Amino acid sequence: SSAASDVYKRQTVTCLNLFSGCIACVMAFEAKYELALLFIVLSSIFDFFDGLLARALNAHSIIGKDLDSLADDVSFGVAPSLIVFSLFKEMYYPATMEFIAPYLPYAAFLISVFSALRLAKFNNDTRQTSSFVGLPVPANALFWGSLVAGAHDLLVSETCHPVYLFILVCLFSWLLVSEIPMFSLKFKNLSWKDNKISFIFLIICIPFLVFLEIASFAAIIVSVSYTHLRAHETVL
């Protein structure tokens, strides 16, 4: 039937998201950060069109919802965790921290754990049909991918203390499950009229992409997150 065909189309796109996420994991484990970011971006594109198809075709199913969450936790939870894990392994550890150097990299998997919690929360939260509460997992993954790929040399230098990275992991893990309302790029369709704010946001992002290149994703996500934090300080 037509309805079943629409569901299969959506699930195919979800599987492409998962496939790209698996490749991102391999690239991250091999410390090929730019390639890992590339496949996370590809996963986020598939995830975007997955949601767009679901809304445009009304192609919703219980299996599709579960499959989407599983794909997202690999692409946007495990992949960025492996990026940060590999980075921790490369970082300079002062003599006073040598005892913790073999163990600290595993803190990177807090990203996977809190991404799974965020996805489970999202699946059962009726407030998030048109906007987000807490940082979306694709945004978190793009932040880590672009930060590490764009500022790798600085992050592995003696000027960057591993504790700073650990604090950042904890902060963004908390943002994933926080009660802070966040901007959403959910498109109902591709018309300007129905998605004016989202299109304007994308246009504003262009200068970031031009001037900051790979690091632009991190800069955009930090800027948006900071804006929401300031706007909702009472939540803190």
Identify the residue ranges that each predicted region occupies.
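C-terminal ends of transmembrane helices
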Residues: L52-S61, A116-Q128, V177-L185, L229-R230
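Hydrophobic alpha-helical transmembrane segments of polytopic
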Residues: V13, F39-I40, A107-L110, F114, ...
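Topogenic membrane-insertion module of multi-pass membrane proteins
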Residues: S5-F48
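Helix-coil boundary and interhelical linker segments in multi-pass alpha-helical membrane proteins
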Residues: C25-L37, L82-Y106, L147-Y164
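Generic transmembrane alpha-helix signature in multi-pass membrane proteins
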Residues: G21-A28, D50-L57, A79-V84
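C-terminal membrane-associated helical module and adjoining short loops/tails
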Residues: T129-R230
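Multi-pass membrane catalytic core of lipid/isoprenoid biosynthesis enzymes
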Residues: R10-T14, A56-A120
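Single conserved hydrophobic/aromatic residue that forms the stacking wall/gate
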Residues: S1-A4, Y8, H228-L236
